[in-house]
Amino acid sequence: MIQQETRLNVADNSGAKQVQCIRVLGGTKKRYASVGDRIVVSVKSASPAGNIKKGAVSKAVVVRTKKEVRRKDGSYIRFDDNAAVLLQNNDELRGTRISGPVARELREKEFMKVVSLAPEVL
């Protein structure tokens, strides 16, 4: 459950380390984002050698949340951290690698590139 002002780890090699959510995309009344939802983020910390700088605004997709996500079979899945993957304006990935597991719900939300690059899909 991600909302405005939530800090997330970055799960790709774009150069950003931590981002802060500044808007949840998907309607005027949408307050919370879950796995597979698109958000607008501001980069709060970045590695010096990366191609993205601190203060940059970018779109991202949520890949892990601490709040559990209910699946259709009745099971729940939750992760140890909140994490996102940065996107370019045309919904292409900014990085070329993804670290850590991602949720299977990304496949249903049409983020196949994220699923294919992830080392583990839960």
From Swiss-Prot:
PANTHER family: 50S/60S RIBOSOMAL PROTEIN L14/L23, LARGE RIBOSOMAL SUBUNIT PROTEIN UL14M. The lineage of its organism: Bacteria, Pseudomonadati, Bacteroidota, Cytophagia, Cytophagales. GO terms for cellular component: cytosolic large ribosomal subunit. HAMAP family: Ribosomal_uL14 (MF_01367). Part of the 50S ribosomal subunit. Forms a cluster with proteins L3 and L19. In the 70S ribosome, L14 and L19 interact and together make contacts with the 16S rRNA in bridges B5 and B8. Signal peptide: none annotated. InterPro entries: Ribosomal_uL14, Ribosomal_uL14_bac-type, Ribosomal_uL14_CS, Ribosomal_uL14_sf. It comes from the Bacteria. GO terms for biological process: translation. CDD domains: Ribosomal_uL14 (cd00337). Keywords: Ribonucleoprotein, Ribosomal protein, RNA-binding, rRNA-binding. Coiled coil: none annotated. Pfam families: Ribosomal_L14. This is Large ribosomal subunit protein uL14. One of its GO terms (molecular function) is large ribosomal subunit rRNA binding. Binds to 23S rRNA. Forms part of two intersubunit bridges in the 70S ribosome. It comes from Amoebophilus asiaticus (strain 5a2). Belongs to the universal ribosomal protein uL14 family.
